[in-house]
């Protein structure tokens, strides 16, 4: 079992002093001149074009950009759920050519099976061939990590949205992925639960330091959670395709103070890059 438990009210993101910080175990992700186009009745539409970025092993990279710019498509390409029409994607130096077991994804909706308990839903994420005893131990470990031990035998309809999302996160981690892909995982939650889930993600990453790629519409969330922030931009209004505009390094070490001047300055910089007045709220 892990040497810490997480409750919904825990606001700390630091490991206890007597627990060693684990080394990053995530895989580096390299995207080289990646493009993704779709064909339809209106002709060909490029969503991503000439996208080149290196995601470091064990880092949290947040992806922000205007609605419809291809953020979710980027996640699907990294995870092998969607094939690029140009370029190449590798995880830990090996090409991604199909649905890739080295990656796991969690969506905005928990997508839990309603007739199974939370523990049984988490169990579905275990790699094939996992022994019964090892599987039970891993599920118990993950439920403790996300603060759901006491709710393990409840069904999804019996728990809150935040608890269901924690179970979804645990299920994604059950595979032991080198890369964890998060597609606006907290977007449907209320403001307070969202803040708690942000802290929980940092706690989980401290214990299981896989590479994380997080898509979010919330600039403040991106800066609070990520090591770096990838800003996508639309290349041309005519075709709407997107590529990398900038990659920014988040200020200071985590946990970050949202009230610090450096945090506020970078938030304003990102919002300006997105074409948003800096006096507006951060969620886009």
Which residues make up each language-model segment?
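Conserved ABC transporter NBD signature motif
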Residues: 87-99, 135
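Conserved ABC ATPase "signature" region
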Residues: 133-151, 203
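The feature captures the beta-strand-to-loop junction immediately N-terminal to the Walker
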Residues: 64-66
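Conserved signature/switch motifs of ABC ATPase nucleotide-binding domains
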Residues: 154-157, 175
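Short helical segment in ABC ATPase nucleotide-binding domains corresponding to the A-loop/adjacent helical element
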Residues: 119-127, 136, 140, 249
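Helix-to-loop junction immediately C-terminal to a conserved catalytic motif
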Residues: 79
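Hydrophobic anchor residue at the start of the ABC signature
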Residues: 169
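A short, flexible loop at the N-terminus of ABC-type nucleotide-binding domains that lies
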Residues: 24-31, 37-50, 130
């Amino acid at each position: 079992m892990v040497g810490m438990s997480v409750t919904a009210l825990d606001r700390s993101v630091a490991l206890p002093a007597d627990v060693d910080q684990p080394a990053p175990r995530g895989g580096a992700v390299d995207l080289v001149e990646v493009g993704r186009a779709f064909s339809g009745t209106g002709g060909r539409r490029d969503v991503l074009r000439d996208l080149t970025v290196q995601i470091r092993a064990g880092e949290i990279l947040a992806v922000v950009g205007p609605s419809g710019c291809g953020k979710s498509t980027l996640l699907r390409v990294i995870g092998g759920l969607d094939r690029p029409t140009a370029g190449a994607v590798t995880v830990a130096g090996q090409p991604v050519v199909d649905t890739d077991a080295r990656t796991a994804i969690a969506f905005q909706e928990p997508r839990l099976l309603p007739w199974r308990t939370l523990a049984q839903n988490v169990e579905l994420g275990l790699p094939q061939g996992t022994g019964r005893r090892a599987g039970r131990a891993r599920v118990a470990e993950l439920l403790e990590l996300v603060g759901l031990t006491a709710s393990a035998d409840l069904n999804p309809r019996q728990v809150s949205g935040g608890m269901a999302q924690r179970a979804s996160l645990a299920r994604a981690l059950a595979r032991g992925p080198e890369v964890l892909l998060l597609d606006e995982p907290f977007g449907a939650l209320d403001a307070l639960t969202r803040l708690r889930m942000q802290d929980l993600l940092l706690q989980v990453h401290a214990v299981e330091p896989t590479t994380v790629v997080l898509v979010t519409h919330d600039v403040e969330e991106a800066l609070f959670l990520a090591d770096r922030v990838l800003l996508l931009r639309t290349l041309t209004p005519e075709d709407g395709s997107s590529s990398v505009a900038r990659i920014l390094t988040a200020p200071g070490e985590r946990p970050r103070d949202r009230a610090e001047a450096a945090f506020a300055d970078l938030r304003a910089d990102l919002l300006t890059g997105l074409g948003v007045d800096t006096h507006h709220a951060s969620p886009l």
